[in-house]
Each structure stands twice: as C-alpha cells, then as structure tokens.
Amino acid sequence: QDHFFFFFKNTFQNVNYNRAARERQWVADSVLVNVDVFPNTSLQNAYFINGTMQDYAVCSGTPPLHVAVIDPSTFESWGTNYNGANPDHDFGNTLCRSRVEKFFIFYQNSAQQLQAFQNMVLNEVPDGHYLLIYAAITASYTSWNQLDSVNMYQTFAALGSDSIIPGRPDRPFAFFTRKGYPNTVVEQVIDPTTGAGSENNYASIHMNAYMPTSISNGAETSTLIGPSMKWKAAYWQQVSIDPINNA
C-alpha cells in the first residue's frame, strides 16, 4: 500500500479515514456515528463509525428495523449470532447473510418480530450502550398500528424519542441514543409535505451523532497482504501534520 486511496479498504478503529482530504484524522474527544437511510432497497442504506462502514443494504423488500448496538468502552458494533460467533446475540431477529452482520434485523409486518425488537432494546441492551435504530425503505407505522398499536410507540418513548409517535406517515427514520441517557437522543423523521428532515428535500436521511470518549489510541488494520513465499521487511512512513514539540 502506497497511494492514500489504497488504504480505503483497511479497517479503522478510533481513526477517521478522510479520503477527500487525504488524511487520517484523530478526534480525541468524540467518535462519529453516521447513517444513511433510503426509501428503497439501495445498497447505500448503511451506517458508519468514524468513517468506517459497519454494515449496509437491506435483506429484502419487506421494510425492516435495523438495530445497531455500540459498546461504550471499545466503540465496536455488536455482531449477530452466526456459525458459533456471538452465541449470546440471538434476540429473535432475522438473519440475512451467511456471515456475522453488524445490525439486527426485525421485520415490521410480524407481531413476533416487533415484540422481539422491543425486548431486545428494552431488556437485552445494557444501559450505557449506544443504540442506533433506523427504518430502511420506510417506517411501517401502518403495520405497527395493526399489530401492536401501543407498545411500539411506548418503546421509543422509553428510549427518549419525542418524534416517533402515532399519526406519522410511513416514511424512513433514524434514531440514536445512549440507553439510559435521554438527553443524548438524536433522531430524524421526514415531513412528507415540506421534505424537512430529509436530505436535500428527498426521501432519504443522512444523520450524524457523536459519542464522547476519553480514548487515547486508535488502530488501522490492513487487508490481507499476499500471497508471498517470503517477506523480508516491512516499512512504514508517516508525515504528521501536527507541530512537533521538542520541549
């Protein structure tokens, strides 16, 4: 790896890969979470931590709720129970791909899935952990009203939402909080008349939220290097943009 663009497939932890500025950026006092939510099955439905994609896309055309859980100590996303990994992360969610996923899928047209969603976010996720919930394709309030007209809205109210309420039209939303800390809520819903809350008055959402941190280190992990019969040496060169203090 030599050219800066070659590094975009690396994995970053507590380091933000800024391709446009060609910089690795360290933000010592916060970690950025952002999410893109589209009113369709776009592969661009995705969320990121400090610029590193955690997971993306939707599994089918059935509107899901995607739930991401972020550990407040490591700022790493929980993974799903798959093939022996994360055996304690089975919350009644739907599994989509043949790998560990970094969000938990709950379909909005199933009463059983809605109940499993409520149990997960209220009872299985510890206080202090970060929750990102987004409705890719659409929030199916119509289904909520038919299947569980009280508990779904009460669940979001218990998490601190004041915008995910009865009477909303079916549109995507994004919701973020540190569980147990209602003052940390960041949420975005779309006004179908004015387009307020959407990206450029379209039906998509781009939302940013921040997680305060005192972490003083980060990591960058490259993709697999090779194959090769033998490696003799590895070299790393870095030019810091910060002033050098020799005092």
Identify the role of each PLM range.
Residues 1-38, 59-61, 200-247:
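Beta-strand-rich ligand- or partner-binding modules
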Residues 14-77, 182, 186-205:
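N-terminal, charge-rich interaction modules
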Residues 45-131, 136-138, 142-143:
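Conserved mixed alpha/beta catalytic, RNA-binding, or beta-rich assembly cores of soluble enzyme
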Residues 69, 119-126, 179-180, 220-230:
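Extracellular and analogous surface-interaction loops
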Residues 128, 171-173, 232:
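Structural beta-strand/beta-sheet cores of well-ordered domains, especially the beta-sheet scaffolds
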Residues 139-211:
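Contiguous ligand/interfacial binding patches
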